[in-house]
Every structure is written in C-alpha cells, then in structure tokens.
C-alpha cells in the first residue's frame, strides 16, 4: 500500500479491561451467565468461575480439579465467612477492596486461604501498622495466620480441595474423603494434622529451601492420580509432605493434566486436545523455590497474572492512599512517619516492583516487554500513563505525597531518584566528569552545560536584545526577574533565526549596537568576544566572563576564558 505502514499496528484501548470487568460485575448482580454458585453460611453467591479463577489461585485449582469438574456447579465452603467472601468478590469484580476495623481480620484470613496475594498483603500491612487496629481481630492478627482457628480453616480448605482433586474412579473407600461426610474417622484427621504440622515445621525451619518440590518433569509428565497411591496411610489424599510439600500455600501441584472434558466451564464437556491443556499446565507450573511459603505472610500465587494485578490495584491504591493522607494531617510527627512508610509500601507494591518477589520468574519473561509499554489510566484525572509502574508516581502529583526523605536535612521528595541526586550534596559525590578538562559535577545537566564552554554553544537567545545564554533558566531569569529592556546588547550574539531585523534595508550595515553580520555564514563566539573584551578591559588582564554580560552570572556561568584561548572553571 503506497504511503501506508506495512505490518501490524498495535492500537491500545486503556479502558477495555475496566469495561469488561464492569460488564461482568453487572452480569453477576443480575444473575446472568453465572456458571457457579458458592454457598457460605447459608448464603448463595452466583458468580463466574473464570473471574474467581483469575483472582484466586485456590479457586483456580478447585475449578480445574477432578474428572467431573464440568458437572460441578455448586460449591459449599465453611472455612471463610460470608462477609469476607462478599468483600473479596467485590474486589474481584470492581478492583476495590472495602475493609473496616470489624472485618479486616476475616478478610485477611480468607485472602490467605483463597490465595489472593494483593489482598493478604494489604490487610496484613494494615494490621501490622495498626492503621485499622481493633480490640480483637481474631487469629488473623497473629503473624502469618498461625492461630488455631486459621490452622483449622487451612486444614478444612485443604481437605475440600483434595476431595475434588482425587479421582473417584480409583476405588477409594468413602472414608478416604473427609469432605464426603463430616463423620470422618479421627485417625484420618490425626494423620492429616500430623502431615500438615510436619510440612509447616519444614517450611519454618527452612529445610524446604531449594528442594525440587515438583519433581524433574512438568505436571504433564507425572502419572495420573491413583497410580500407586493405594499404599499410603490416607490413599489418594495425602502424599508425602515432609519433603515434597510445596512452599506456595502447602498445596500440592496438579498430579495429572486435565481430562479432555475438563475445560472449566459449567455444563459443557469440551473436546479440546489433552496435549494443549497439558502444555498450558506446564507453563503455569512455577519454578522450584520461587513461590514463598503460605505461612510466611507473602503472596501464595503460583502463576499470578501480573498484568491483571496492575489493573486491579489502581482504585484500591488510590483509596488507601487518600485515607493515609487524611490521617496524616491530624496525627503527630511519629504517626506521620509511620503513614509515610505505609504510603511508600503501597506505591512500591502496586507499581509492579514487588512482582519479582511474589510471582515466579517464568511469569516475567513474556510480560516484561509488554509491561514496559503498558497503558494505565489515572483514576483521578483520567490521563493515560504509558509505562509500567509510572501510575503511582503520577498519582503523587494529585495527593502531594513525598515519601522519600533525606535522613540528614529532612527534605522530602516525590521520587527516589531525586533523593539519590540530593544526597550528593551531603556526600560530595560528583560522578559526571568532563573528558576535556577533568571538571567533575554532581548532576548530568551541569556537565552538559559545562561542555558548552568548550564547544561555544549558547542555544538560548532573547528575541528582544539578541543576548544568548548557555542555560534556559538564565534566559528565563533575564526575561522575568532582571527584565529585558529590548536594547540589543553590545556583546550580544547574532540572531540565530531572525537574521537582520526587517526594518534594516538590504545591503545596509547593521544599526548601532548590533553586531556585524556573520562572516562566511559562521557565528562569532569566544574568539571575537575575547578581542572585544581585551579592548574594553580596564585592567588589561585580558580575562573575560563568557556569559556575555559583565557581572551577570545569569548570562553564562562560572566558566572563564583567557585571551590565549584556555578555558578554566
């Protein structure tokens, strides 16, 4: 095509993801196209399993485990409260988490059990810094959810997942499935508790660090469930956990690729190829040791979608940030210091810098290039920001937050790189070196301005008096602070754009006060100035200020040139 671009063109739609999420939430509230129902404390939560699976690793495992998962459309769970599940569902569909002093503990516990890293991190930080302090927030207030209630809920969640993961065709007795009836023998539960306790102790002691929890091959290479589980004390339910327990949430990896009918959609037995689904699971398997432990309080996700985290975090970030700013105005200095740490934490977390610690390395390889060109919309001014991690920095322009403080002079900055440059004033560091004269500078722009001393470049010119300047701020000061009287300077440079003023006849000489026309199309710089200055210098020293205006440091800088052409700083 003549005059066109040959090749694909990527056209981003920044509002597309939020529009899709809004549409799904509207369907949920109206009960449209919901393919699964979650029962908690007698309440029904119709929802879309794809949305829950994208937000929660636990629901993803639950909805893609078992041979009859396509026919399972009702799940009754008792290890989370209805109020906590309501808040988490609203978070999944609206990207906004609503917490209060009364429910922050329940939401934290539910987020840990359901493996929602973003929510668990934020709630844990709120409790740790006592931003939402309560008299009694339950066992969730203990470090890493180590309370007895959380341990019981963790056990129940694990049993429920194992019940659906186990293949009902392996001829196991009904007592092997604790969730098939609440009357399971105590011996099985004791063995379960011992296995969990051993795994927890191994993680706490650091014995699991570096082990290959997933074996030498991907999940697709492992035998299906039931091929050799009959010899265990709890067949098909609890494999060996002392050495093979994965650190990411104490949940085992998938033991087999999904069946051909296991497509995760209600009421549809798809005929997809097993190889494609096995390859998808193989890509979703985390690298050994990349996922932090469930009880460590870190995120438990194994294959979290980093791009979705950025999209979900914007409104939550703004809500928490504005709350912290409001509290900072009424608190003392120490409290404001703590609030600064909270703000810093949120900005770093939602900027994407945390993903190297939360998500395994495999999820970054294919997303780094995409994230570098990501578009995000500011929730305040709706300006589209290009570049991953730049949205939190832009939001600071609205909130006035300056999270980075100099520990010497207490000056605060909005960006960490600005603080790093500021610290050079205290340390005396001057990393930028002139290759011609050896002068050192603390700032890159100072070196750039200094190099104009050697090159003679003065790119900034006053349109009224034709005076030229090395730096733009000097020209601005000349126009605003000093005031330009419009009289051409005796030592001003030649006009770089306008040429001879239009009121001067062609062929006539330059009017008094204006410099002569350039010779051979070249402008005069330091050499001509030195000759003029030597004639006018009262002491005959031959030294001049290359600023172009005697005693006006705004027209040049600290550089000085001698009559012999040697420059010094």
UniProtKB/Swiss-Prot annotation:
There is a cross-link at residues 430, 527 (Glycyl lysine isopeptide (Lys-Gly) (interchain with G-Cter in SUMO2)). This is Zinc finger and BTB domain-containing protein 7A. Homodimer. Interacts with BCL6. Interacts with RELA; involved in the control by RELA of the accessibility of target gene promoters. Interacts with AR (via NR LBD domain); the interaction is direct and androgen-dependent. Interacts with NCOR1. Interacts with NCOR2. Interacts with SMAD4; the interaction is direct and stimulated by TGFB1. Interacts with HDAC1. Interacts with SP1; ZBTB7A prevents the binding to GC-rich motifs in promoters and represses the transcriptional activity of SP1. Interacts with the DNA-dependent protein kinase complex/DNA-PKc. Residues 548-557 have a biased composition (Gly residues). Residues 371-569 are annotated as: Mediates interaction with SMAD4. The keyword Chloroplast does not apply. The gene is Zbtb7a. It is found in: Nucleus. SUPFAM superfamilies: beta-beta-alpha zinc fingers (SSF57667), POZ domain (SSF54695). Gene3D superfamilies: Classic Zinc Finger, Potassium Channel Kv1.1, Chain A. It comes from Mus musculus. InterPro entries: BTB/POZ_dom, SKP1/BTB/POZ_sf, Znf_C2H2_sf, Znf_C2H2_type, ZnFinger_BTB_dom_contain. Pfam families: BTB (PF00651), zf-C2H2 (PF00096).
């Amino acid at each position: 095509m003549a005059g066109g671009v040959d090749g694909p063109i990527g056209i981003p739609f920044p509002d597309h993801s939020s529009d899709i999420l809004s549409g799904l939430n509207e369907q949920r509230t109206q009960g449209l196209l919901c393919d699964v129902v979650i029962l908690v404390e007698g309440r029904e939560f119709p929802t879309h399993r794809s949305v829950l699976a994208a937000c929660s690793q636990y629901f993803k495992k639950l909805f893609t485990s078992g041979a009859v998962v396509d026919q399972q459309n009702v799940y009754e769970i008792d290890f989370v409260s209805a109020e906590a599940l309501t808040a988490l569902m609203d978070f999944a569909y609206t990207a906004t988490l609503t917490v209060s002093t009364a429910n922050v503990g329940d939401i934290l516990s539910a987020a840990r059990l359901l493996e929602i890293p973003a929510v668990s991190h934020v709630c844990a930080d709120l409790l740790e810094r006592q931003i939402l302090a309560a008299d009694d927030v339950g066992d969730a207030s203990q470090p890493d959810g180590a309370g007895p209630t959380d341990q019981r809920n963790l056990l129940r969640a694990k049993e429920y997942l194992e019940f659906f993961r186990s293949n009902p065709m392996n001829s196991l007795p009904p007592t092997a499935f604790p969730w098939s009836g609440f009357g399971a023998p105590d011996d099985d539960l004791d063995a379960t508790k011992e296995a969990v306790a051993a795994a927890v102790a191994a993680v706490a002691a650091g014995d699991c660090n570096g082990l290959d929890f997933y074996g030498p091959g991907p999940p697709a290479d492992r035998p299906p469930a039931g091929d050799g589980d009959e010899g265990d004390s709890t067949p098909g339910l609890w494999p060996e956990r002392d050495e093979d327990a994965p650190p990411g949430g104490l949940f085992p990896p998938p033991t087999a690729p999904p069946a051909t009918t296991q497509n995760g959609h209600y009421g549809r037995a798809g005929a997809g190829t097993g190889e494609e689904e096995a390859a998808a699971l193989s890509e979703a398997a985390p690298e050994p040791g990349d996922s932090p432990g469930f009880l460590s309080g870190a995120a438990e996700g194994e294959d979290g979608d980093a791009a979705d985290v950025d999209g979900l975090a914007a409104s939550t970030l703004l809500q928490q940030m504005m709350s912290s700013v409001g509290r900072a105005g009424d608190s003392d200095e120490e409290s404001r210091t703590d609030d600064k740490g909270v703000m810093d934490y949120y900005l770093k977390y939602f900027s994407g810098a945390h993903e190297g610690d939360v998500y395994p390395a495999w999820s970054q390889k294919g997303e780094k290039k995409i994230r570098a060109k990501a578009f995000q919309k500011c929730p305040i001014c709706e300006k589209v920001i290009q570049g991953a991690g730049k949205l939190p920095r832009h939001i600071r322009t609205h909130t006035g937050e300056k999270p980075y403080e100099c520990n010497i002079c207490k000056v605060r900055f909005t960006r960490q790189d600005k603080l790093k440059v500021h610290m050079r004033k205290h340390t005396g560091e001057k990393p930028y070196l002139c290759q011609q004269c050896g002068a050192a500078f603390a700032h890159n722009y100072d070196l750039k301005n200094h190099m104009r001393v050697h090159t003679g470049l003065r790119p900034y010119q006053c349109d009224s008096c034709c005076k030229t300047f090395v730096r733009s701020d000097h020209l601005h000061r000349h126009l605003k602070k000093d005031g330009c009287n419009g009289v051409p300077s005796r030592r001003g440079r030649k006009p770089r754009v306008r040429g001879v003023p239009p009121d001067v006849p062609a062929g006539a000489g330059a009017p008094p006060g204006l410099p002569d026309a350039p010779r051979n199309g070249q402008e005069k710089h330091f050499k001509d100035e030195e000759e003029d200055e030597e004639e006018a210098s009262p002491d005959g020293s031959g030294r001049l200020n290359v600023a172009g205006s005697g005693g006006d440091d705004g027209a040049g800088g600290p550089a000085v040139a001698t009559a012999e052409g040697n420059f010094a700083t």
